[in-house]
Amino acid sequence: MSEQEVTYSMVRFHKSAGLQKQVRPEETKGPREAGYRRCSFHWKFIVIALGIFCFLLLVAVSVLAIKIFQYDQQKNCEEFLNHHNNCSNMQSDINLKDEMLKNKSIECDLLESLNRDQNRLYNKTKTVLDSLQHTGRGDKVYWFCYGMKCYYFVMDRKTWSGCKQACQSSSLSLLKIDDEDELKFLQLVVPSDSCWVGLSYDNKKKDWAWIDNRPSKLALNTGKYNIRDGGCMLLSKTRLDNGNCDQVFICICGKRLDKFPH
């Protein structure tokens, strides 16, 4: 075969309009994936932030609940202690009042018993004697002993100095009242008239003094006695009062039992 002509031809297929409009997936995949990643990052940040917020809120609520519980517990404890203290104080007051009432009841019983004994002893031992046995004169005396002391009531009226001499002539002295109990006892047994006792005003000392110049446990408000009314003391059923020493009244002499000769 001699020279032959080789003819080349190029075949070109034209794409249809539909195929031309199709976009390769690879061409759109990059932008979509980038947008999705950005959106996913934002949501993760929000979720983490919400989680932290919820955790902090839970912690705050827990702390608040604990504080409220502790406050309630402390308040209840304080109320209980206050109530307990109040109950203890009330019980102490009740016990104290019961003890005071018991003591007062005992004192009342003792006073009633003492009063009965005093009246019984006075009615039993009061005797009228002829004072010639004691003074060598015709004075009448009531006498009795009670406790550690004997009492002589010289019924013939005398001045305070006369009573002092009458008592001394019988180896006695005008009565010194030792305390409030003795005063109350004597007011039960003295005659209806007032009686001289051994208390007088000492012009040198400018004060009232007992006949033995010794103090007494009897508390006297001597400031109420006006010396102008008299400087000698009288005993009646109701009170001690001062009077004119030159007036005449019954005498009360006294002597302790341990002072009598054996």
UniProtKB/Swiss-Prot annotation:
A Pfam match: Lectin_C
Disulfide bonds: 145-150, 163-251, 167-253, 232-245
Residues listed as glycosylation sites in the UniProt record: 86, 103, 123
Keywords per UniProt: Cell adhesion, Disulfide bond, Glycoprotein, Lectin, Membrane, Receptor, Signal-anchor, Transmembrane, Transmembrane helix
Domain C-type lectin, residue spans: 138-257
Gene Ontology, cellular component aspect: external side of plasma membrane; plasma membrane
Gene3D superfamilies (UniProt xref): Mannose-Binding Protein A, subunit A
Residue spans, topological domain Extracellular: 67-262
UniProt-listed GO biological process terms: cell adhesion
Transmembrane segments: 45-66
Motif Cell attachment site: where in chain: 137-139
Tissue-specificity statement: High, in T-lymphoma lines, very low in normal lymphocytes.
Topological relation to the membrane, as annotated: Single-pass type II membrane protein
Cytoplasmic side of membrane: 1-44
Complex formation: Homodimer; disulfide-linked.
Stated name of the protein: T-cell surface glycoprotein YE1/48
Taxonomic source organism: Mus musculus (Mouse)
